[in-house]
Amino acid sequence: MVASAPLATDATANPQRGSYWITTFGCQMNKADSERMAGILEAMGYREASAELDADLVLYNTCTIRDNAEQKVYSYLGRQAQRKRSNPNLILVVAGCVAQQEGESLLRRVPELDLVMGPQHANRLETLLLQVDSGQQVVATEDHHILEDITTARRDSSICGWVNVIYGCNERCTYCVVPSVRGKEQSRLPQAIKLEMEGLAAQGYKEITLLGQNIDAYGRDLPGITPEGRRQHTLTDLLHHVHDVEGIERIRFATSHPRYFTERLIDACADLPKLCEHFHIPFQSGDNDVLQAMARGYTVERYRRIIDRIRERMPDASLSADVIVAFPGETDAQYRRTLDLIEEIGFDQVNTAAYSPRPNTPAANWDNQLPEEVKVERLREINALVERCARKANARYEGRTEEVLAEGINPKDPSQLMGRTRTNRLTFFSATGADGHANKAGDLVQVRIDAVRSFSLSGSPLPH
C-alpha cells in the first residue's frame, strides 16, 4: 500500500533556484514519474529551461528494459559530466531504473553525479535535493514505501492525464529486470486515485489512463475480503469506483498481464460507457514452451480465450500487444508460431523487440543465446508483418464516423487537430469544419474517416 507523504516545507519554496531539464527514457510509468518530479521542482522554485544545455539542474529518468536505452543514458551523462567540470554548480541527477540497478556504481562511473535515485523515490525528490544542497552526494535506491504525491504534477498534456494506481511488480519473468528495479507491488487506495482524477477533471482533463506495471494485479496488497470471498480491491472494482468522476469522458488502463485478465474485468469494460474499447495485453510469444521458459504463467490457448471474450462483448475493440523474438533457445518453428498468432488475431498494433539480456535475470545466464544476425532478421520480418496487420486493421475505418478526442494541434500542419478514437487510433482532421465551426483541444469531435495509413487515420469533422 502506498504511504502518505509529509507536507512540503516553506524552506523549499525558493524562486532563485534556477532552471531544470528532464529527459525521459522508456515507458509510460517513467513519463508519469517525470511529470510528478517536474511538479516537485516547480513547487521548489525551479522553472523549465528552454534547452538542456541552459539548465541549472539536469535529470535523466532512465530505463533499463533494453540495453540500447541504457547505453543512450551513459552517452547523455558523458556530455553533462564534461559540462559540470567547467560549471560545478550544475546539479546532475539520474533517476529511474538504471539508477536503481546501478546504485553507487554510477557514482564511480560518473563521479560528477549529485543524486542517484530509484523509481520508488520519485516523490522524495525534494528531500533528496535538500541533501544535495547541503553538500552531499546522494544515493537513494533502498526499498521504500512509495509516498502519495501531494505536489501537482507538471503534465505534458492538458487534455489526457496519467494516474498511477499500482507501482512495482511481483512477477518473475525470466527476461525482465522490472521487479528488481521497481520493487514489489504497492497499490494506491481507491479514494486517493479518485481524488486525483477529480482534481484533473476540475482542471479540464477529459481522458485518464490508469497506469501500472502489472495493472491487473491492483489491490492484491490491500486488505479486505468481500462477503462473496474474493478480494475487496481489484482493478474491476476500481474501474467501477472511479467511473462516475464528473468531467472525465474516457478511461483507459495499461499494462495488463494475461494471467490476471479476468472475464469479470472484460464485462466491466463492456458495461461501463467511459471505458475505451482498446486493450494492450502483451503475449510475448506464440509458443507455449517459450512462454514456459519465460515464466509467463499462461498458455497461448488462455490468451486466445481472453481475446475471444473481448471480441464477443466488444466486437470493434482494438488490440495491441508486446512480443519478444529470438528469446534464448527459440527455434524457427517456435518463432513461426508467434508470426501465426499475430496474423490469426489481427492485432491493431504490436510493440516488438529482439531479446536483450538484462543484468540479474535468469535468462541472461543461459547458454542458448541466439546470434545477433538471427535477432536482426526475425525482428525485421515480424515488423513487416505487424505493419501489414496494422494497415489491414485500419482499413476497416475508411468511410466510418468516429468520435475523436482532440488533444492538440498537428505539429506538422497547424490547420489540423490531432487526437485519438476510443479505439486508440491516432487521427488527424481539420480544425475548422465545413460549417465554419472551430474545433479545439478537449472537444469530442465526430470525424468522418477519409484516408487510412498503417498507424494513423485522417478525416473531416462533421457539421455540428
Curated annotation (Swiss-Prot):
It catalyses: N(6)-dimethylallyladenosine(37) in tRNA + (sulfur carrier)-SH + AH2 + 2 S-adenosyl-L-methionine = 2-methylsulfanyl-N(6)-dimethylallyladenosine(37) in tRNA + (sulfur carrier)-H + 5'-deoxyadenosine + L-methionine + A + S-adenosyl-L-homocysteine + 2 H(+). CDD domains: Radical_SAM (cd01335). Binds 2 [4Fe-4S] clusters. One cluster is coordinated with 3 cysteines and an exchangeable S-adenosyl-L-methionine. Residues 395-463 form the TRAM domain. It is found in: Cytoplasm. Keywords: 4Fe-4S, Cytoplasm, Iron, Iron-sulfur, Metal-binding, S-adenosyl-L-methionine, Transferase, tRNA processing. GO terms for cellular component: cytoplasm. [4Fe-4S] cluster 1 binds at C27, C63, C97. Its cofactor is [4Fe-4S] cluster. Gene3D superfamilies: Methylthiotransferase, N-terminal domain, tm_1862 like domain. The keyword Ion transport does not apply. Residues 155-392 form the Radical SAM core domain. One of its GO terms (molecular function) is methylthiotransferase activity. Its EC number is 2.8.4.3. Pfam families: Radical_SAM (PF04055), TRAM (PF01938), UPF0004 (PF00919). [4Fe-4S] cluster 2 binds at C169, C173, C176. GO terms for biological process: tRNA methylthiolation. Catalyzes the methylthiolation of N6-(dimethylallyl)adenosine (i(6)A), leading to the formation of 2-methylthio-N6-(dimethylallyl)adenosine (ms(2)i(6)A) at position 37 in tRNAs that read codons beginning with uridine. Monomer. Belongs to the methylthiotransferase family. MiaB subfamily. This is tRNA-2-methylthio-N(6)-dimethylallyladenosine synthase.
